[in-house]
Amino acid sequence: YSSAASDVYKRQEYCRLAGLFPEAEVVNGTPLIRQARSVKTPVEIEMFRRSGIAHAKAYEQIPGVYRPGMTDIEFSIEIERLMRLQGCLGIFRVFGRSMEIFMGSVLTGDNAGYPSPYDFALGGQGLDPALPGGANKTPLKEGQSVMVDLGGNFNGYMNDMSRVFSIGKLPEEAYTAHQVCLDIQEKIASIARPGIACEVLYDTAVEVVKAAGFADKFMGTGQQAKFIGHGIGLEINEAPVLAPRIKQQLEPGMVFALEPKIVIPGVGPVGIENSWVVTNEGIEKLTNCNEEIIELS
């Protein structure tokens, strides 16, 4: 047998490889390759740790680049600059050919609930239909939240982290919803361990958000993402996927992003996203910086 990732290679490349092994039966190797890549080596995990430290250092400087009167895209550009100066490579790699974005997204107000054709937790309209995702020149307004969600590619391995900022004070509902997301993170961190199925972690998050009364705003409003986490690695969307009916079990060495988020209409997104590594006993956070809503001034 000869294995090739048929959903990654172009037809021309696929046919060329098949021609090199005329006696072999070419089969789709994507599932095997993705399964192998879902468990990282100690060297790879160390790369994630270093990336997480650099990512956090950039995020800690975000309040210093805010200026009153900014739009979301102006704010995004300044944050991207912080990331690049910290060593970010500035490229966001994804699996497959149907999803693309620059370095991530900065979403504020109702743009956070804008439907997207991409499989993101939150989409955004973007600057043009040619790339429908992220900031759309929305002014940063008093009483609205801003979610910064940039992929941290500092050494080829993609960290993922989201933090929330506010322009002035937010309605109390937003702070309550943000705490619900932190509670989901804490609950999942307490039960996640090798052997637990991804669907159990997703169902646990849904139970918490339903009990809190935010199910209709969880992971979006009109278009709600049906996952709360995803594997990360050389690409931002690797296995495992924390989603309903996913029987795959966590294994030591897996690295994933957990991102419970809620969108409050008229206010914007709240929630949290961190990168985690599965250990022999549970999971360990790789992206560490302030998780509360930070007021900008």
Identify the role of each PLM range:
Residues 42, 183-193:
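Amphipathic alpha-helix from the class-I
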Residues 55-144, 191-233:
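Active-site cores enriched in adjacent His and Asp/Glu residues with nearby glycine-rich loops
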Residues 20, 24-43:
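A short, charged helix-loop
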Residues 1-5, 9:
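Single conserved hydrophobic/aromatic residue that forms the stacking wall/gate
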Residues 139-186, 234-297:
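Charged, cofactor-coupling segments
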Residues 11-22:
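Short, aromatic/basic amphipathic alpha-helical patches
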